[in-house]
Amino acid sequence: MEKSEKKPMRFSFRRRPKSVSVDRSEAHAADVSIGQYLEKLNYVSQEEAIKIDQELFSEYAYSVDQLMELAGLSVATAVAKSYPRGPMPKGGTVLVCCGPGNNGGDGLVCARHLKLFGYEPSVFYPKQSNKPLFQNLTKQCQEMEVPFLSFLPDSQLVSDSYNLVVDALFGFSFKPPVRPEFNDVMDKLKKVKIPVVSIDIPSGWDVETGGDADSLQPECLVSLTAPKRCSRNFKGRFHWLGGRFVPPALAAKYELNLPPYPGTDCCLLLTPPPS
């Protein structure tokens, strides 16, 4: 028998037939008012936040650096949406104040992404961790020429030199009062005359009840994974939800009732845009 001659393989680039149904649920969700979701949104307790984190690491096999990267990127994106680089004076300067824990790691990731977004971040990281993860995050910033401050200037100099401050000092595991070595830092941040963006929890706040009249009052808050109970008392201009990594089954288990993120965005504005 003669071997049949092989025909060259051809690829078709024709348009999809009009009769094919396309799922537009995500696009539709972006158009739906956020208000209807806020009524059901679950503001989690400190205990719930800890359990959710533990399950992300164990049941869902996330690593700390994975979640930190996604969280820090969402914070940087929320900053860019709230305070666009274009019209920003002072060369787009931003001061990122990092604490010794995972919240500080989120801040380091945020600083790196802000640099990539065209801002000029500086980092104040007074109590650096000796863990490899944090040392790597620090080196990544340094290799991208993000300067690290050896001390925190007074409030007026910070206000004159920077456009805004990212507060990455303490996260949802914090329990008042503030440790003595951070009292001076907190006092200076409370007195700055530029916007403060807090990551997950305004530093110094009780995770359940919030802060008092003497507490840090950020203009922008980026809640991660799910908003914490204290954020009900947030009165600033921008409240974002970030950290788009919660598996649907986990969200259902804790009845988080998270609103759908628009399109491919990694952060979602929970408050109406200021006029």
From Swiss-Prot:
Coiled-coil ranges per the record?
A: none
Q: Which InterPro entries match?
A: YjeF_N_dom, YjeF_N_dom_sf, YJEFN_prot_NAXE-like
Cofactor binding mode, per the note? Answer: Binds 1 potassium ion per subunit.
Drop me one GO molecular function for this one. Answer: NAD(P)HX epimerase activity
Q: Does the keyword Nucleotide-binding apply?
A: yes
Q: Which reactions are catalysed by this chain?
A: (6R)-NADHX = (6S)-NADHX; (6R)-NADPHX = (6S)-NADPHX
Please name the top-level EC class of this enzyme. Answer: isomerase
Cofactor dependence: K(+)
Residues annotated as domain YjeF N-terminal: 49-258
Listed PROSITE patterns: YJEF_N
Q: What is its EC number?
A: 5.1.99.6
Q: Which GO terms describe its cellular component?
A: mitochondrion
Q: Which residues bind (6S)-NADPHX?
A: N102, N103, G104, G105, D106, G171, F172, S173, F174, K175, P176, P177, D200
Q: Tell me the SUPFAM superfamilies matching this sequence.
A: YjeF N-terminal domain-like
**Which keywords, in A-to-Z order, does the entry hold?**
Isomerase, Metal-binding, NAD, NADP, Nucleotide-binding, Potassium
Protein task: Catalyzes the epimerization of the S- and R-forms of NAD(P)HX, a damaged form of NAD(P)H that is a result of enzymatic or heat-dependent hydration. This is a prerequisite for the S-specific NAD(P)H-hydrate dehydratase to allow the repair of both epimers of NAD(P)HX.
Q: Which family does it belong to?
A: Belongs to the NnrE/AIBP family.
Q: Which HAMAP family match?
A: NADHX_epimerase
Q: Report the NCBIfam families cross-referenced here.
A: yjeF_nterm
- UniProt protein name: NAD(P)H-hydrate epimerase
Native species = Ixodes scapularis (Black-legged tick)
